């Protein structure tokens, strides 16, 4: 549904150039919720603004629903008629709600329909339906100043849906909201994704957003995508930075002759007593150094850091036992020396891409 190829954006800043995007290749499948995460300055907002050409890419292509938007951009600063028509299929929600304070909630949602030339009766009906969809039918005659932050963002979402888009872009839409309101907005985005078949591309710096709502995710750093894949693939990939951030676990070896292993549980394996089985089967004492578990996409997923007695060479069989139970097991690098070994799955998911940034 959304594909960027070799996307580059360079800004001119006085006497120097600033590269915000450096050859970004991104593919968002139809009907999925895709999260792009990274620290401030990573290039996330530049990326999402290039997707609908609010920012003109310096080079590369952007394709949405099979149409190359960069080919429609034209040469002037004003968007071509073809690009404006293509943009009606792309809705966008911003961090700051950008509502007109002098207009009612209903009038704010009607605004894009006015611009599209929809008749008064039809746009009022459409705006009312959208407010009902986002749970604000009773606020149609209210003004933005009378709404909470979460309600304002719901109005922004309703407005973004006015043109019946196929794609919804969300630029840090929950970063100014409290945790409870954030959860309600994320649930709304997921509901809209499922009810309307929307493809959602969201930008965030919060790992909880990815964990709560995303099917796939990408990590950006210095204008490049350094890791991407479905959330399930990322969690199943030893050494994944995103997996580590989604489910952080800590703890170091208590002595030199100890082996520390990160174990990832997914699905049925998350509810089985595998660690106690390991202890009984091999008659070894296992220390749990840290653990994190949550539900992602309706599946229970977790990571646990355990310590086994003895060096790695003495624990090859117990670690193999963990793999036989359908778990991912990775030996953690010794902080005092190079990593002894890493136990990896027999086959890395083909759809997962990972790039080392030099």
From Swiss-Prot:
Q: Does the keyword Cell membrane apply?
A: yes
Any one GO cellular component localisation term in the record: plasma membrane
Which keywords does UniProt give here? Answer: Amino-acid transport, ATP-binding, Cell membrane, Membrane, Nucleotide-binding, Translocase, Transport
- Coarsely, its chief localization is membrane
Annotated binding of ATP, by residue: 38-45
Q: Where in the cell is it found?
A: Cell membrane
InterPro entries noted in UniProt: AAA+_ATPase, ABC_transporter-like_ATP-bd, ABC_transporter-like_CS, ACT-like_dom_sf, MetN_ABC, MetN_ABC_transporter-like, NIL_domain, P-loop_NTPase
Q: Which SUPFAM superfamilies match?
A: ACT-like (SSF55021), P-loop containing nucleoside triphosphate hydrolases (SSF52540)
- EC number(s) of the enzyme? 7.4.2.11
Give the ABC transporter domain ranges: 2-247
> Coiled coil located at which positions?
none
Q: How does it sit in the membrane?
A: Peripheral membrane protein
Provide the GO MF annotations for this entry: ABC-type D-methionine transporter activity; ATP binding; ATP hydrolysis activity
Catalytically driven reaction(s):
L-methionine(out) + ATP + H2O = L-methionine(in) + ADP + phosphate + H(+); D-methionine(out) + ATP + H2O = D-methionine(in) + ADP + phosphate + H(+)
Subunit structure as annotated in this protein's UniProt entry: The complex is composed of two ATP-binding proteins (MetN), two transmembrane proteins (MetI) and a solute-binding protein (MetQ).
Q: What does this protein do?
A: Part of the ABC transporter complex MetNIQ involved in methionine import. Responsible for energy coupling to the transport system.
Which family is this sequence assigned to?
Belongs to the ABC transporter superfamily. Methionine importer (TC 3.A.1.24) family.
Q: What is this protein called?
A: Methionine import ATP-binding protein MetN
Q: What is the lineage of its organism?
A: Bacteria, Bacillati, Actinomycetota, Actinomycetes, Kitasatosporales
